Amino acid sequence: MGAERKSIVTTVEASLICHSCSWRGEISNLYSCPVCGSSLLVAYAGTYELPNGVVDEGIWRYRRFLPVSADSEPVTLGEGATPTLQTRRLDPSGGLLLKNETVNPTGSFKDRPVAVAATVARELGLSGLVCASTGNTGVAVAAYAARAGLPAACVVPEATPAAKTAQIGAVGARIVRVRGNYSDAYALARAAESYGWANLTSTYINPYMLEGDKTVAYEIFEQLGKRIPDWVVVPVGAGPLLAAIHKGFEELGVSGPRMVAAQAAACAPVVSAFETGAKQVSEWEHSVETAASSIADPLRGYPEDGTRTLSVVRQSGGTAIAVSEEETRQATIELARSEGLLVEPGAAVAAAAYRKLAAQAVVSTGERAVVVLTGHGLKDPDALRSAAGSEAETGVVEAGDVEALGAALEVYQ
């Protein structure tokens, strides 16, 4: 049942290295260090130089520092090249910028890591793609598997929103609902590795996923005129996106920015460790009940992933902060009504965290912060309905009732 281990020769000399013991090996279908069992990352020889051209080309303009061979055909749907938007109404000072990942092909940032990992999997000749997911990764894996001509299976928690599972099933992936939370789905998905399937779960398990995530940093750097923001605020479950963005800036040979791990208070293992000064993150033993389902990861069975994220936050001089359900709901409303951006609750957590940090003067006036908006609001229609409230509609009026129309418009006068 096990798959033969194959390797890829990359454009720039690259290798897998262990996050903990510094073991080094070739680019292959390996998910953990053969010496100590820790997670792996990809390292390249030399400092990355940005290519000529425009950011509109998407993530594959950076392929020289991605773990694929020079002549490989990318598995792509046009991911990346997402805008970094200046806010005016939400933050008149101009210090807040929004990295809008909702415009990726399947509506979330997960298209970046999945595109790279699917390309690697196809190059290695693996049998299919599997993931554990709260929805967004599953949708991306299903779509990119279809694009690659590979089978896909998505293991999801029982409470995953129907809007997300409908998208997964629509593109032909098998959906396995697990009674339990994300950690339970994660444990089951790992079993597929022994069948020669690539595990594209969005934790630290697949080192090639982070390579797609890091392109967010490359784009921010270019879109800001090759300048570094003071802060980058990222909604966090296990935290690979945050770590990957930090890695991307490091590969550019620049210092900063300070990284902020934003979590929902109902599931905040990284924040808890940060606030108590702990060196290691513990599994979240409380109930996990939050509208921000896309980042509700209690890390049960793999708390070391949270520890890795915590280490990056501290290394960058950043912070970790939790926000309440009401703060998240308000941020969802503000983004929609002030900036025209529909985001899911998991993404709104980052915006709520920024507002909280600004109010506490952690983020100072004059500093620039990029908030990463990770997923589209259409991923979770129920959350949108809750945020909109009943006051948005006037009720049914008679055709031709100009007075009723005028009454509806009076709210803007």
Residue map of PLM features:
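PLP-dependent amino-acid enzyme catalytic core
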Residues: 2-413
